UniProtKB/Swiss-Prot annotation:
Cited InterPro entries: Glu_synth_asu_C_sf
Family per similarity comment: To M.jannaschii MJ0658.
SUPFAM superfamilies reported in the protein's UniProt record: Alpha subunit of glutamate synthase, C-terminal domain
N-terminal signal peptide: none
Residues that span the membrane, as ranges: none
Gene Ontology terms for molecular function: oxidoreductase activity
Name this protein carries in UniProt: Uncharacterized protein MTH_238
Length: 306
């Protein structure tokens, strides 16, 4: 069905779309990582199937603070990197304000990966893993409301969290969800503690802060880490520390294969791991020992990869 533009009672401009079934990458600010495929997987100026709006029109509408209502189900990667001012598309590489995405049905996996601002409302079910988001108390009857972890920690909470504890400088998550990209683009001296496993790219593009996972992590943990500390109190899948730039990645277990691939800086401390050039194993420094002890870990169990 065709989409149309209208207004809600709060005077926010609204686009309504009713796609042909669950469509992936609606409101995806990366257009399914466009720089990797140059339009072969998703053309930003292609119409969303069954609607009169393109993927780009939806993203630009959200950048302007508007609302997008999906009349039906949504596919994978809804609102990916929402609020990221991506340098590849001419942005400054930081964070911008974003609008609202509302889904009248269910949402498939990886909703809100690397999301840094904006709000998502969902009437139906949401499949794990989810992204860098938590549920907060909803102000719309019949809808669940989700906000960015990074946004809350950097700009303050504007709603009561669900199964999440907030203390000064700390967020403790224990809601049973598996997450991708936890702590994405975090740039504040705060701590995130996540009880349970996480999946892809924990701490991606972090600059400051600490993310501590009380469980195992998936691939690409610490990818593009640019500062701060990521602590995994368990094992990681492969490619930990890929393209890492700065900071510490600490794995209290096995950091996996292809450790530190394309690493430009930073330090990986792990009990075990199989590095690839330019990363290699070396002795712990005094700074490494101090960091491990401050994290409550035993330095003699760890190896340095840098």
């Amino acid at each position: 069905m065709f989409g149309f533009l209208g207004r809600r009672r709060d005077e926010r401009e609204v686009i309504e779309i009713e796609p042909d079934g669950p469509v992936d990458c609606i409101a995806d600010f990366t257009y399914n990582f466009y720089w990797q495929h140059r339009g072969e997987k998703l053309d930003p100026d292609e119409r969303i199937p069954g609607t009169s709006h393109t993927f780009r029109e939806v993203v630009e509408h959200l950048k302007d603070g508007g609302e997008v209502i999906v009349r039906g189900d949504a596919g994978h990667r809804l609102a990916s990197s929402m609020g990221a001012d991506l340098a590849y598309f001419g942005g400054g590489g930081g964070v911008m304000d974003a609008g609202v995405v509302t889904v009248e049905g269910d949402v498939d996996t990886r909703m809100g990966i690397s999301m840094v601002s904006g709000t998502i409302y969902v009437k139906g079910a949401v499949r794990d893993p989810i992204g860098n988001i938590i549920e907060v108390r909803s102000d719309r009857r019949g809808y669940k409301k989700f906000m960015s972890v990074t946004d809350i920690l950097m700009n303050g909470l504007r709603a009561e969290p669900v199964n999440v504890t907030l203390e000064p400088g700390r967020m403790v998550i224990d809601d049973g969800h598996v997450r991708d990209t936890l702590g994405a683009r975090l740039d504040a001296d705060v701590e995130i503690i996540h009880h349970g496993n996480v999946d892809l790219s924990t701490g991606i593009l972090m600059r400051r802060g600490t993310v501590r996972v009380m469980g195992d992590a998936g691939k690409n943990t610490g990818a593009l880490l640019s500062g701060g500390t990521v602590i995994i109190q368990g094992d990681c899948d492969d490619f930990s520390g890929i393209d890492m730039r700065d900071g510490y990645l600490i794995v209290d277990g096995d950091a996996g294969k292809f450790l530190g691939a394309q690493r430009r800086g930073g330090v990986i401390l792990a009990r075990r791991g199989k590095p690839v050039p330019p990363t290699s194993e070396s002795d712990l420094t005094e700074d490494d020992r101090r960091v491990l002890m401050e994290a409550g870990l035993r330095p003699h169990l760890f190896r340095r990869f840098s």
